[in-house]
Amino acid sequence: MAMAPSPSLVQVYTSPAAVAVWEWQDGLGTWHPYSATVCSFIEQQFVQQKGQRFGLGSLAHSIPLGQADPSLAPYIIDLPSWTQFRQDTGTMRAVRRHLFPQHSAPGRGVVWEWLSDDGSWTAYEASVCDYLEQQVARGNQLVDLAPLGYNYTVNYTTHTQTNKTSSFCRSVRRQAGPPYPVTTIIAPPGHTGVACSCHQCLSGSRTGPVSGRYRHSMTNLPAYPVPQHPPHRTASVFGTHQAFAPYNKPSLSGARSAPRLNTTNAWGAAPPSLGSQPLYRSSLSHLGPQHLPPGSSTSGAVSASLPSGPSSSPGSVPATVPMQMPKPSRVQQALAGMTSVLMSAIGLPVCLSRAPQPTSPPASRLASKSHGSVKRLRKMSVKGATPKPEPEPEQVIKNYTEELKVPPDEDCIICMEKLSTASGYSDVTDSKAIGSLAVGHLTKCSHAFHLLCLLAMYCNGNKDGSLQCPSCKTIYGEKTGTQPQGKMEVLRFQMSLPGHEDCGTILIVYSIPHGIQGPEHPNPGKPFTARGFPRQCYLPDNAQGRKVLELLKVAWKRRLIFTVGTSSTTGETDTVVWNEIHHKTEMDRNITGHGYPDPNYLQNVLAELAAQGVTEDCLEQQ
């Protein structure tokens, strides 16, 4: 059994060079290293931007991971907030940077992995890999991970990991690959300590960090000390290497939802003069007939503020953009993270903050008070307070058809029987007003069917008073869908999309929680999942983009944007999926077809909306 290393084993840096490992934190608080290739790219960008902090140019503040690995195209690392942001779902993950000696496991490209339940191999966090490598090098065949805070032992002989409480075993393996990147520990002249790369220290002065300022964010301890936490925890423990994080180690929930407010520029460089950058926001809630499990709710709103007026003077500290987050929620994370990515891309420092719940001013004050830097659109909601009475199915059929005395010599495409014979649904559909031999054609398109077949088709749908021709898809009445309850929010930014450089950007955020299927869904009474929410979508803020936005609002009210069905990507059943109205979920890199530039997108989505019965005529009726 391996014992905790003694103080004599503490390693000391004798070189300004070290190996950098970047890791991200999952929802359970476990850290996962990026691959050596991705880490090399991140470190290169980080060092470059860190060098620019000393006056070598403007900063992007964000690192697009897709440039290093195409499979990571949706992900961006936002350096000021030390956050990995997924553009298509809005998911935010904490990231950190570790420095190891060059002779460590990461420096030699050694990675230890364990076999997960789905049959894939998952890498241990870098400090665990290094510890395992050290113990095996000393001849310890059975390594106890308790010094790192884990309730496991790893048997090098059998290549297994054993839970000391449940005795459950997993396979482990040792992989050798490319070494992680070697970096230089940057410190300005006169600085004797290891430079802290946290954004608070980097912004503290224009001459670099000072030795006494690293203690709040950098751990430099004897190798892998016995933790003071319970042995079952999943938080990380650091060794002789330095663990860089933006703040003191927060709680598990706080690390993801409540970053502290930083009041200075993350990199110490003054942003360009933006004048008054307006940020517009509106929200549209859909509260249709939806059954939610106890305790479920939709997310609240997020407010943002932008500084106005001239930029800061060279000797002053520029103001930041605080993102107000009254309650930690996924939509708020998405909005705050998206704002951080957008604003940092133009050089404006953005920091997430946890704000107290604001008190609502009187309505008269809300109506009269306005700000030059923030403009809010009227908040709209749809609350089905008084549902319309359900029309009689037979009457709906009669409203859109004309009965034919002599049926044409053709088949009914619904039941595949001759129109001159009885309806194939006569044995399962009972109606006193429509006979089994009755035939009619739809008034607009003139396609003919058994009227009883049309009745069966209508009763099998939403029964919302509308019909859609099964032959040509012509819509009669106002078509509605089966979209679950959720929320639609809209923001506007003064940044352009590729191919639309002459205008700003419209950001749409859809939020739908998990729930219970209603009578209009495939399996009424059973739960449904809502993966990847909130989802972010982008439109150019020009005349055509604004028209598409207004039509999407109509489609949202009619419950046409999403539905409950089977995912075409994962095969999961009873889950929320898109409903034939395509959205752009990425701002750029149109490799997958979900981003920009795409010169035909707006015309295509207008055609898809029209196929659902949502046209400009709907806007005139509002």
From Swiss-Prot:
Compositional bias segments (type: Polar residues): 274-285
A molecular function GO annotation: ubiquitin protein ligase activity
Pathway the protein acts in: Protein modification; protein ubiquitination
Modified residues (Asymmetric dimethylarginine): R213, R215, R233
Entry function: Regulator of Notch signaling, a signaling pathway involved in cell-cell communications that regulates a broad spectrum of cell-fate determinations. Probably acts both as a positive and negative regulator of Notch, depending on the developmental and cell context. Mediates the antineural activity of Notch, possibly by inhibiting the transcriptional activation mediated by MATCH1. Functions as a ubiquitin ligase protein in vitro, suggesting that it may regulate the Notch pathway via some ubiquitin ligase activity.
Notes concerning its domains: The WWE domains are thought to mediate some protein-protein interaction, and are frequently found in ubiquitin ligases.
Protein name in the entry: Probable E3 ubiquitin-protein ligase DTX2
Gene: DTX2
